[in-house]
């Protein structure tokens, strides 16, 4: 009977000790959590503000490549030059001036014959190519020409169309305007958050500017390094700022 009493007594002691340990641990944990909230409160509130605007490309770069494979380099050069002339005529007839067209240098390389995975050292054909690049502010003209380039290809000219790159030259002007609007947006957000908990927004203690994002109008793309879509004439330009405010 005494042995049973001793066992129950030891269980009671262990239970009390465990309760003390748990209470101490919880107390320490709550103290740490409380300290964390206090630190966050003393640092104020950090919010992200954003602003966007619609923009239209005012510059375009369009590169076309005329490429031909022929038995000899000479034959390839002749055909490529003929193709370049046809492409140039198409561009000029469509409203592009000669001054807006740049012809790249001719490039060629020999295609070797291979047998059983080994080169025989014999050249069986030559690939010759030349770039035709348009640089202009006539973005609408280039858009129309790019849609009709198929007529040149249908005529037998071997053209590789890399597609126009539509660019905005006024980004340096848009950036400060957008950042100012993003700052206002950040303050509105901070005031809404602090008002909900009975506080007020104080002075700005830190500002970090984000990268500019240039995207298609319906895009949600956002890259850490910044996005710059060149596939469309119409674009959306977005700026963000991260702002820390004191709170009261």
What spans do the regions from the language model cover?
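Short, charge-dense linear interaction motifs
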Residues: 2-248
């Amino acid at each position: 009977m005494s042995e049973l009493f001793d066992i129950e007594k030891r269980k009671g002691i262990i239970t009390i000790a465990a309760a003390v340990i748990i209470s101490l641990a919880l107390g320490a944990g709550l103290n740490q959590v409380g300290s964390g909230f206090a630190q966050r409160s003393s640092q104020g509130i950090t919010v992200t503000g954003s602003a966007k605007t619609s923009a239209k490309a005012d510059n375009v770069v369009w590169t076309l490549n005329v490429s031909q494979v022929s038995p000899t380099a000479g034959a390839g050069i002749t055909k490529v030059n003929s193709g370049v002339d046809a492409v140039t005529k198409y561009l000029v007839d469509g409203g592009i001036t000669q001054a807006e067209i740049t012809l790249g240098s001719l490039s060629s390389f020999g295609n070797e014959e291979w047998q059983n995975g080994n080169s025989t050292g014999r050249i069986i054909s030559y690939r010759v190519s030349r770039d035709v690049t348009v640089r202009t502010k006539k973005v609408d003209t280039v858009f129309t020409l790019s849609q009709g380039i198929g007529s040149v290809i249908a005529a037998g000219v071997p053209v590789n169309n890399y597609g126009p790159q539509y660019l905005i030259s006024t980004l340096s002007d848009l950036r400060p305007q957008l950042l100012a609007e993003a700052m206002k947006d950040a303050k509105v957000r901070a005031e809404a958050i602090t008002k909900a908990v009975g506080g007020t927004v104080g002075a700005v203690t830190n500002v970090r500017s984000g990268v500019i994002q240039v995207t298609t109008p319906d895009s949600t793309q956002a890259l850490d390094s910044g996005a710059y879509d060149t596939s469309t004439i119409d674009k959306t330009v977005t700026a963000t700022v991260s702002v820390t405010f004191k709170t009261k």
